[in-house]
Amino acid sequence: MAEKLKLARSMSLFEEAKQLVPGGVAGIRRPYNFVPGEYPIFFDHGKGGRVVDVDGNEYIDFLCAYGPIIIGYREDEIDDAVINQIKNKGFCFSLTQEMQNTLVKKLRELIPCCEMAALVKTGSDATTIAIRVARGYTGKTKIARYGYHGWHDWCVEVKGGIPPKLYEDIYEFHYNDLDSLKAILEANKDDMAGIIITPIGHPNGAEVQMPKPGYLEAVRELANQYHCLLIFDEIRSGFRCSLGGAQKLFGVTPDLSTFGKAMANGYAIAALVGKEEYMQVLADKVFLSSTFFPNSDGIVAAIKTIEILERDRILDVVAAKGRKFGAEVEKVVEESGVPVNFTGAPWMPYITFKKDEAGLYKKLRTEYYTQLIRHNVFMQPYHHGYICYRHTDEDLAYTVEAIRESLAEVKKML
């Protein structure tokens, strides 16, 4: 059994933080989303595919800042491009800088549905404006949704502080289940503005699902049939599964789509992209503005990140790493005798525990992630992982063995 990590400074900083910030740290970074007392709460720095906490413990990081790190931490080419922009031109002005056009032309070149784009800062910004565009264009109100789309009022799972009327026109359907979507569309056929879906199913704390053959095509057809817009939320899949997103990978083109996270390797930028007919409502009918949306630091980072992704065929390398890693982990899981599932795409691996009526799976899950972090492998119990370009073959091989040893400890509890 691996030894417990020394986390004294992390814990001390957290106690101080709770007097300064509600909850100490924001949202999904709070200890209850990991294993309290076993995981660090504050990182100090990162490089490549590794991060170091404030107590000096180094980890192979498979959460990748919840997805933005597609290449690696502190990539010199990207950072240098941003620093050059800040030092020599500036990045925050009353008007827009010309690199906006450069980035949007590149997005239009790569993403099947992209004829126009609106640049924003976060995934939540992008999905929320997508809903506004769908409603503004169609003149309808209701939305069918699947997946996590951010923290804004219309879609957040935790409803505290949100009047029901702000989300009462949002209807949730099940992934890979056409009947659940059809029922919503038929019941609201005269007022359905749009369908928003993550093209890869990645619910929090549950198995990652790939679309069944014909599923996304059928969703596309239903959107046409019920005269509503199809929106792909590609915040996680974009610039990770392919340069054109899951829509390019699976050959199904939505009307609108959102991108972010890996788009700029960690810098704050996201985009709503789509067909000109629909996007044009943002020119006059639908309002979109923010002090920081035009800031060029994220735009420059995105331009440079995409340049590197294309030039070095980064996503092909990431997929190959993920396939090899996944095959080895799957074998370990099968041999472990522990009731777990290994799911996901090559770029999004995830081990989940099979639920049982007695709730033993919760204890098994806690023990597994306790052992894993003690092996200095950073994964999140309730969120799938990510592979990045800077994860080395040695990192991945070590992690396979760490998973093997962690599952062996879990097996002792059965």
UniProtKB/Swiss-Prot annotation:
Main function: 3-aminobutyryl-CoA aminotransferase that acts specifically on coenzyme A (CoA) esters and catalyzes the conversion of 3-aminobutyryl-CoA into acetoacetyl-CoA in an alternative pathway of lysine fermentation.
Obligatory cofactor(s): pyridoxal 5'-phosphate
Coiled coil found in the keyword field: no
Record protein name field: 3-aminobutyryl-CoA aminotransferase
Family: Belongs to the class-III pyridoxal-phosphate-dependent aminotransferase family.
GO biological process: L-lysine catabolic process to acetate
pH relationship of activity: Optimum pH is 8.0.
Originating organism: Cloacimonas acidaminovorans (strain Evry)
